[in-house]
Every structure is written in structure tokens, then in C-alpha cells.
């Protein structure tokens, strides 16, 4: 976790290990530092389902420190391993990180993505991985954080994406009554380096590629992407990947949401993905003290209940 907005040094009860549960530490931050922002530093963090279930995550760092200017660091310590047969190479690492985030969105959770360079820890210059926030008025730090909370973001290290859908930035929720349909026209402006052409541009809908456009397609359409029609709740975002061989350079917009009726989009498959993850993580707990073990196991049981409830209310496959 990375915590922003602290007014004084953070006093931690533990320097690491299983006890207390990291969700308890995050809760202590919320209590003692009102207004602090908690960013999950990697989507594959073993404790992601636990932290999300306890309301301890304000944002997820989808563009993280493994993505470097001249390489992709494909070494995972303390992270949930991906299936490298299914997600091979640098592209696979990026798709795995994004897919975890998409599963969160598929559970009806409206958590914005972020980016960070980890300059000083990995071979990245300051500002390589970037979080852009759309502001309606003059810049201020407070307005920037409010814009991030609203999901009005584009994150990445590749092309700068400036989307508008029906005149709205990312984070917008389009509402419609039950039984109605929502038709939307995405408009996108892209800024990229001439020596790093666009490899592809995709619209992601409910975690799947809805369609892909080449740069020629984009230019021909003059920034007007293909229209979308929703007859059920869901979400979508835009992803762009650069044509570059020595690293993986990409950008994604924050998601747009469509809510038809009273319920957001919740996928059973995505909820089960995190429920299985909670069980797998709980089996890793090693604590000798009975009381410490009881407290930590209880935190994981609460997370299990959260994801079981998500499975129960899922209306989508």
C-alpha cells in the first residue's frame, strides 16, 4: 500500500508479517488520518481481495513499477503468480495486471486506476508512469484528488488519451430505468510520439475486447469510435498500446459506467475469482499465537463473506 495525504508520520503497529492483518493497519490509517488516500501498489498483491473487502482501497495501481522505460521487470516477489502459459511475456504481465482490475470492475466496484513510476526503486525516471486527472476548473491539489476520486483519469506510459463520451470524462455513470437501453458515442483524442506509433486501440467492455481499431481506422473516423449500446448495466474503457519492442508501453482511460435499473454490473465469474483468491491466501497464514491467528483468520473470514455475497447477487455470468 502507498498512503498519500498524511499530516504526520504514520505509526505502524507492525513492520510486516501476518499480524496484525494488513486490513487492520489500513483501518487504523483511516481512523487516525482522515482524508488519507490509500493506493494499492500492485493488482496482484496477495491481499487485494482482503483489502477491497474491508474498504481499504481508494485506487489500484494498474500501471505499476514493473513497467519501465527500457524493460519490463518480470520478476514477482510477494505477488500472486500469473499463469504464464495463458499470459506469456511482457504483454502477458500487462494483461494479467489489467485483468485483475477488470475483475474488480466486474464486481460492481467503482475504483479508479492509477500509475506510478517507482523512480529510485526501479530504473524509471520520475514521471514515466503517469496519472492524468481531468479538471473542470483551475488546478489545485484538492481538486486533483477529488477528480481522481471521481475516476476522471487516464493512466499510462504510452499515448495520452483524452476521451469524452456524450461530453463527459471517465468516471461518469450513465443511468437509465430498468428495461431501457443506453446508446453512447465515444470520442477520443490521442497524443503520441511519431517514433512510437500506435499498435492498436481497443474498447474494453465488461472486461472483454469489444472492438479494436488501427491508427488508420482511428484517423479515418476522425476520433469518433464505434457507438455502444447497453441493455444491461456494465462498464467500458479505452486502451491504447504503442508499437515498441523493448518494453510494454500503454495507456488506459478510467472506466465509464452504465447502470440500468438499480443494480450495477456484477459478474459471477469475477466474484468467484476473488472468492477463490481469498481461500488461497488464507491457506498461507502461519501464526503460532492462537489469539493472533484468530484475529487474522477473522479478517479473512469477513473478506470471504464479502465475496460470497458478491457471488450471490451476481446477475451476469
Regions found by a protein language model. Name each.
Residues 28-29, 33-36, 46-49, 102, ...:
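C-terminal functional module detector
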Amino acid at each position: 500500500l502507498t498512503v498519500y495525504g498524511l499530516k504526520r508520520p504514520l505509526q505502524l503497529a507492525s513492520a510486516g508479517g501476518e499480524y496484525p492483518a494488513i486490513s487492520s493497519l489500513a483501518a487504523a490509517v483511516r481512523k487516525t488520518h482522515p482524508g488519507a488516500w490509500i493506493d494499492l501498489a500492485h493488482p496482484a498483491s496477495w491481499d487485494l481481495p482482503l483489502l477491497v473487502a474491508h474498504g481499504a482501497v481508494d485506487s489500484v495501481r494498474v500501471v505499476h513499477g514493473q513497467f519501465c522505460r527500457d524493460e519490463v521487470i518480470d520478476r514477482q516477489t510477494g505477488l500472486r503468480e500469473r499463469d504464464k502459459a495463458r499470459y506469456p511475456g511482457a504483454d502477458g504481465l500487462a494483461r494479467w495486471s489489467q485483468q485483475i482490475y477488470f475483475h474488480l470492475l466486474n464486481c460492481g466496484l467503482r475504483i479508479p486506476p492509477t500509475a506510478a513510476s517507482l523512480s529510485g526503486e526501479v530504473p524509471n525516471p520520475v514521471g514515466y508512469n503517469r496519472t492524468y486527472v481531468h479538471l473542470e476548473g483551475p488546478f489545485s491539489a484538492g481538486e486533483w484528488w477529488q477528480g481522481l476520486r471521481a475516476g476522471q483519469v487516464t493512466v499510462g506510459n504510452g499515448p495520452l488519451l483524452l476521451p469524452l463520451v456524450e461530453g463527459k470524462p471517465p468516471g461518469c455513470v450513465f443511468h437509465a430505468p430498468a428495461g431501457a437501453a443506453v446508446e453512447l458515442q465515444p470520442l477520443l483524442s490521442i497524443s503520441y510520439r511519431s517514433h512510437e506509433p500506435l499498435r492498436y486501440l481497443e474498447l474494453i467492455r465488461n472486461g472483454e475486447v469489444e472492438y479494436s481499431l488501427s491508427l488508420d481506422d482511428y484517423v479515418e473516423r476522425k476520433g469518433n469510435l464505434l457507438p455502444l449500446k447497453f441493455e444491461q448495466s456494465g462498464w467500458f474503457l479505452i486502451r491504447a498500446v504503442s508499437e515498441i519492442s523493448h518494453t510494454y508501453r500503454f495507456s488506459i482511460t478510467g472506466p465509464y459506467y452504465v447502470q440500468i435499473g438499480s443494480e450495477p454490473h456484477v459478474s459471477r465469474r469475477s466474484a468467484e475469482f476473488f472468492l477463490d483468491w481469498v481461500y488461497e491466501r488464507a491457506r498461507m497464514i502461519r501464526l503460532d499465537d492462537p489469539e493472533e491467528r484468530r484475529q487474522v483468520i477473522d479478517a479473512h473470514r469477513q473478506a470471504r463473506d464479502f465475496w460470497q455475497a458478491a457471488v450471490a447477487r451476481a446477475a451476469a455470468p
